[in-house]
A protein has these predicted regions:
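Sec/Tat signal peptide C-region and signal peptidase I cleavage site
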Residues: 3-9
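Amphipathic alpha-helical segments
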Residues: 9-131
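Short, exposed beta-strand-loop hairpins at the edges of beta-sheets
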Residues: 135-139
Length: 152
């Protein structure tokens, strides 16, 4: 008897390919471009430090035999300082970029979750599972395209 009740109360289930929806998000490209713009000055600063170090290394290699010991030592110290500065700033940029990327992704995934809920409510689904947790699902239960449309 308990089985009959469970069968009668069958839930309507769908699945969504969140990765596919994420790739199709129009906001994703906008966020990516904004992040590149926001971090451009720091990336340019790193390129400048690299160029300065390269110039000094080339001078040391090219003119090393013509330079006095004091000049050689000064160039080596300058190169070491530039290398250290580069490493510190590159690490800071990497951390800031990764943190910002995580924040932006979280916002985008929240947008996707809201769209999934909207589509599920509209179509009467009781449960929506991400495709990554699914062994098999009939294509007609895939609501990914509906979610993508809801986001545009």
């Amino acid at each position: 008897m308990a089985f009959a009740n469970a069968a009668e109360a069958a839930q309507k289930i769908a699945y969504v390919n969140t990765a596919q929806v994420f790739q199709a998000l129009p906001q994703r490209e906008v966020v990516l471009q904004k992040m590149q713009k926001d971090f451009k000055s720091k990336a340019d600063e790193l390129k400048s430090i690299q160029a300065q170090a390269k110039t000094k290394i080339e001078k040391l290699q090219r003119d090393g035999e013509l330079l006095g010991q004091e000049e050689i030592e000064k160039l080596r110290i300058d190169i070491a300082k530039l290398d250290s500065e580069y490493k510190v700033k590159a690490q800071a940029l990497e951390k800031a970029s990764a943190r910002r990327e995580a924040e932006e992704k979280a916002k985008l995934f929240k947008t996707i979750q809201d769209a999934v809920k909207k589509v599920a409510d509209k179509k009467g689904y009781d449960l929506v599972i991400d495709i990554s947790a699914l062994q098999y699902g009939k294509p007609e239960y895939n609501i990914s395209e509906d979610v993508i449309k809801a986001l545009k």
